[in-house]
Amino acid sequence: MSRVGKAPIALPKGAEVNFAGGLLTVKGPLGTLTQPIHSLVKVNTDNGTITFAPADESREANALQGTMRALTANMVKGVTTGFERKLNLVGVGYRASVQGTALKLQLGFSHDVIHEMPEGVKAETPTQTEIIIKGSDKQKVGQVAAEVRGYRPPEPYKGKGVRYADERVILKETKKK
């Protein structure tokens, strides 16, 4: 059995869970998320906890039990507290600003990069060189952060580019004669 999958998920106040037709729906103050649950996993929702059990004793069912539990725990955390990812812009003239639902980036190209935010994800720019991406879906927040970083990843000689706030860029030495 999966050690991760055995642990029950405690529902915080303000969160509701509904399991019907193979779909697990979690509602909270920050929105609603839905996840299809694999047929090899059984779900029990009672007195403020969610537990998962494999439908049979196969290795696949045990693996899926842990996966479904982890995805559901992220959904519960997302609709109650939310997720955020911080990015920093390093480089002369690199700037970011929010225009409606889009993020406008000036990254040293001959044109501005406009990145449209998907539904459920918001961007903030406390300063011109900081971006905070927030949302209730952990996968979407991480995907948007990776896409924004992908426009100009940190280069290894000067470290210029878009980087995660907790990322350490290892700089190479230049070629010596």
Curated annotation (Swiss-Prot):
Belongs to the universal ribosomal protein uL6 family. This protein binds to the 23S rRNA, and is important in its secondary structure. It is located near the subunit interface in the base of the L7/L12 stalk, and near the tRNA binding site of the peptidyltransferase center. SUPFAM superfamilies: Ribosomal protein L6. This is Large ribosomal subunit protein uL6. GO terms for biological process: cytoplasmic translation. It comes from Ralstonia pickettii (strain 12J). It holds the Pfam family Ribosomal_L6. Keywords: Ribonucleoprotein, Ribosomal protein, RNA-binding, rRNA-binding. GO terms for molecular function: rRNA binding; structural constituent of ribosome. PANTHER family: 60S/50S RIBOSOMAL PROTEIN L6/L9, LARGE RIBOSOMAL SUBUNIT PROTEIN UL6M. InterPro entries: Ribosomal_uL6-like, Ribosomal_uL6-like_a/b-dom_sf, Ribosomal_uL6_a/b-dom, Ribosomal_uL6_bac-type, Ribosomal_uL6_CS. One of its GO terms (cellular component) is cytosolic large ribosomal subunit. Part of the 50S ribosomal subunit.
